[in-house]
Amino acid sequence: MSKLQFVWVGKLKEPFFRDACAHYTKKLGRFHKLDETILKDAPGKLPPMDKVQHEGKAIMARIKPSDMLICLDEKGKEMTSVELSKHLQRWTEDPNLTPTFVIGGPFGLADEVKNAARVKLSLSKMTLPHELARTMLLEQLYRAASILRGSPYHHV
């Protein structure tokens, strides 16, 4: 069973996001070993760009050379669920690399993180709250894993 890692900035504050993420994490866990790191939001008194830099340093401190960094960014590559499933298959084929998905806090990701990413993935051209992006990513990864296994979850 291949492993997927997640590095998130901030806890899920809304119960409906916590419930949805728990739901898809449980389902995705049937197909992959999951490792989740939740980093604290930067101190509230910092200006937004300082928060982004602070969180970026915390993210990069968690990334190992064997991690294949995939960051979510509204300017990243958009793909269909089927395309994501094909990428997921490739990303998990190399036992020496661990796909590591990163979502920043409310103000986004530091350039340092984006520049280190092998893949920049976009869920939409629209700006999404990071809690919604986390939920959507987990659902789409579950859908991608289901597609790869021929599960009826994805209706074509």
UniProtKB/Swiss-Prot annotation:
Catalytic activity, EC: 2.1.1.177
Catalytic activity: pseudouridine(1915) in 23S rRNA + S-adenosyl-L-methionine = N(3)-methylpseudouridine(1915) in 23S rRNA + S-adenosyl-L-homocysteine + H(+)
Name of the top EC class for this enzyme: transferase
Cellular location(s): Cytoplasm
Main subcellular localisation: cytoplasm
GO cellular component, one term: cytoplasm
InterPro entries hit by this protein: Alpha/beta_knot_MTases, RlmH-like, tRNA_m1G_MTases_N
Family annotation (Pfam families): SPOUT_MTase (PF02590)
Keywords: Cytoplasm, Methyltransferase, rRNA processing, S-adenosyl-L-methionine, Transferase
Single GO term (MF): rRNA (pseudouridine-N3-)-methyltransferase activity
Residues that bind S-adenosyl-L-methionine: L72, G104, L123, S124, K125, M126, T127, L128
PANTHER family per the UniProt record, alphabetical: METHYLTRANSFERASE, RIBOSOMAL RNA LARGE SUBUNIT METHYLTRANSFERASE H
Its biological purpose: Specifically methylates the pseudouridine at position 1915 (m3Psi1915) in 23S rRNA.
Oligomeric form and interacting partners: Homodimer.
Family the UniProt entry places it in: Belongs to the RNA methyltransferase RlmH family.
Name of the protein: Ribosomal RNA large subunit methyltransferase H
Gene name for this UniProt entry: rlmH
